[in-house]
Amino acid sequence: MGSSRGIRRKVAVAASAILMVSGLSACSSGSAEGGTLTFLTFAESFTHADPQRNYTGQDLAWFSSFMHRTLTSYKRAPGAEGSELVADLATDLGTATNDFKTWEFTLRDGVTFEDGSPITCQDIRYGISRTYATDVITDGPTYAISMLDIPKDADGNSVYKGPYKTDGNDTAALDKAINCSEDGKTITFNLSRSVADFNYTLTYLSFGPVPQAKDTGDQYDLAPVSSGPYKIEKYAPKDEMVLVRNENWSKDSDPIRNAYPDKIVVRFGIAEEVRDQIILSDSEPNAMSLDGILPTNLTTVFNDDGTVKAEWEGRAHNVYDPYVTYSAVNVSKVNCLPIRKAIYYARDFGSILQIAGGQAFGGDPADGVIKPLMGLDYKKVTGLEDFKMEGNPEKAKALMDEAKKTCPDVYAKATGKGLVFDTVDSDTNKKAATVWIDSLKKNAGINLKFNFIEAGSYYAVVLDRTKQGDISRAGWAPDWANASTVVPELFLEEGGFPMSQVGKDPAYPEFEKRAKANLLEADRAKQGAEWAALNQYVMDNMWVIPGLFTKSQDMWGSNLEGVFFWEPQGAPSFGDIKLKS
């Protein structure tokens, strides 16, 4: 799961207990339903509102709280309890047979779309079918393609091409893989391999229902149909989104969601300092920032050790989130291992971390893409002992000397016109860019040119192979408590977030063979050890420049309560926020 904050991405470690510095906001006896809840963001839009295209943790948390339902979900609760799997559209967590290759679910009674029409198995199958239209429905997770028992053609592509193509499209294969009962109440998934935690996969909005008659292809992103407690009244990117109550939603058929405010407004394009000052001054006590807090304002809310100041108790938190940040090196363009390593050793990471607020707020230096909270999937990476927080120019220059001999073309590019570095357009990232540029030039002779991209458009750009630069900032967290949702997703060519573009790297065939074999490994301990070994393999080839095991800060107005950090989505549980008065 990718991060949409600054630039971090995906779902939390389901078994971890995230440290919450401030705790759960207390509920007052006078709180009631009603009023308008406001969210503020510097982004010009959500990354995606279309459920099949939604793959950033905060957006998953937001839309799954207010609009989009799935067969299963996570319990709305703080701490480790929030990682408990619960039934949503389904009556239970499913029945697995055939060595976990067949999964059956029954839909609850009374579940409907916003127009009152019933949600059926066919609607869920149609929603999932959109994932296969990879030329139209972009940026979302691809678990359906990798897990469902739909044959591949000679080129390794699915014989089913999605709902928008007719010629040569094997629709019967979809119907066999997702079988619906005659009454539309029972849905059976037939998988190509054993997946013991498939019911966790179904928490993703990409497995949610879409009414075929309302599907508008890529334009569905602007007006998706709701199955949750709210529906869209207005969505105007660069302006605002307004949600109002869905009169056809019933708490009786949706026991896991709340519907406290009458209206929810998201204001886009708010300058970062203006956004922060609205919350800091409490000029809008019903408002919450969606972007965290500028590093320059952290000491107003928190003590130097990261704890919440007394006057901000109940209005802010500073938590370890599930994300790992990194800079994906586009190996198809920077196909020179010594240069990739030189970038890692040359950067002044200490200064970059200070811009992010230091370790009390930014987090801890990462050694790969798997966080220690993953337990048996994590093992400390070796071979990085020459890393220095301030940069290691001696090591970096030696690597550049090697690159000059072994890959002169890439060396000439890096030291000449330079490498293009994609990142989100924000004040903090612009400050960090200066450090990157100066330290790589000084310590390795590498020239960098930054490509600053508007936040709401960022992933659409960097996941487009024709538009991505040489290096791209990103962040990821496991989709559930298994690094099968990290390593393959980030580095297999068919993964959901393959920004490193490693398919033509000489080291890729071995990685591909081992990763695909490990997806089939039934012994969880052996599987975890191999994910840790493949994390080491990734770092041996420096397919990413590791960043941080991150922390997140949120703050909100004085009239809000019920705010807590929701572990599995790495974001607040937005649907539990209410107005005090």
Where are these regions (language model features)?
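Periplasmic binding protein-like
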Residues: 37-40, 116, 279-286, 439-498, ...
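N-terminal lobe/hinge region of extracytoplasmic solute-binding protein
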Residues: 40-98, 225
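Gly/Pro-rich hinge or "lid" segments in bacterial periplasmic/extracellular proteins
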Residues: 76-80, 158, 191-259, 263
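Surface-exposed binding/hinge segments that line
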Residues: 106, 123-125, 130-211, 236
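Extracytoplasmic/peripheral linker and loop segments enriched in polar/acidic and small residues
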Residues: 180, 353, 388-389, 446-460, ...
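Ligand-site clamp/hinge motif
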Residues: 213-224, 249-304
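Structural transition elements
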Residues: 230, 363-405, 425-431
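Long beta-strand-rich cores associated with HINT superfamily self-processing modules
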Residues: 554-581
